[in-house]
Amino acid sequence: MTERGLCASGAQPFCVHSFAIERENAYYRDMFTEKINNFDLKEICISGQCFRMHEDDGAFTVIAGDRYLKVSQDGENVTFFCDREEFEGFWKEYFDLDTDYEAILAAVDPEDSYLMRAADTACGVRILRQGLWEMIVTFLISQQNNIPRITKCVENICRAYGRKCRAADGTEYYAFPEPEALASLEEDALMACNLGYRSKYVVRCARKIAGGSFDLEALKTMDYEEAKAYLLTLFGVGEKVANCICLFALHHVDAFPIDTHIRQVLDAHYADGFPFDRYRGFAGIIQQYIFYFELHGDREIV
C-alpha cells in the first residue's frame, strides 16, 4: 500500500510519512558526485560482464557479494549513494577508476576502422573488479547461455542460498552465497534455479573450494598464465570460462575470452591474426569493446 493509501485510511499517516522522509533524507546525506570520463553506467550494465547490476528509475543498483550500491549519472558526473569511506575502500576499485582508459582508447590503431568504431561505441565500458568466487559460478553458468538467462540464474541462486540483507535505504537484497552454502547440495539441486547441466559444475567446484583443495587466495597471487592453468583444473571450466574469470575477477587484462561473437569478428576482420602485441597489457579491455560492439553497436556501417 502506498503512503497516500495509508493517509486515506487514517492509519496514523503523519507518523508513517515523516518516518519515510526522515529515513530517505538520512540515506541521501551519504552521497557525493565524482567527475569521471570514459565511464558509462548503461554501457557497463549491458556489457555482459556483470549480472547483478540493474537500471532502476533513472539510476542503477549494483550488488557485489554482500554489498549494495545505488549510483546515477549525468554526463561525466557520477553520483554514488554511499559515504566516502565505503567508496574509497571498495567501489573505487570495483569500477576500476584508477585505470587510464583514455590512454587505452588512444592506443587503438587508427588504421583499424572496425576496432576504432568498436572502441568509440563502447568507450564508457570498464572492466569491473568483481568477486572471484562469484565470477567462477557466474561464468560456469554462462556456458551455452544468454545474458537474460544468466542474470535470472544468478538471482535464483542468491535468493535460494544467499544471506538476506538490507541496504541503508531499506532495500532488501540477497548476498551471493559462499562456497560452503552450495557445497552440501546434491549435484542436481541447482536444477531448480534453472542451471540445467551446469548445476553439477557449480556444486563440484563449491565442494572443492569449501574442502580446501582449491585455494582462492593462492589464485589471487598468480600471474595470468598460472591463474588460467589453475582454473582449468576445476570441473566444468574450459578456456573461455577461465579467461572470463581471469579478466573480470582477477583483472588480468591480457586475458582475451573468445566466444562465438569474438570468433566471428576474428574470422571476418583479422584473418591474418589479431594484433595482440600491439595491445599487450590491455588486450582484454579491447576484447570487451569488441564484445559490446557486437551486441549493441551499429555494425551495418562498419
Locations of regions flagged by a protein language model:
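N-terminal amphipathic/hydrophobic targeting modules at extreme N-termini
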Residues: 3-17, 24
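Accessible peptide chain termini
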Residues: 1-2, 31
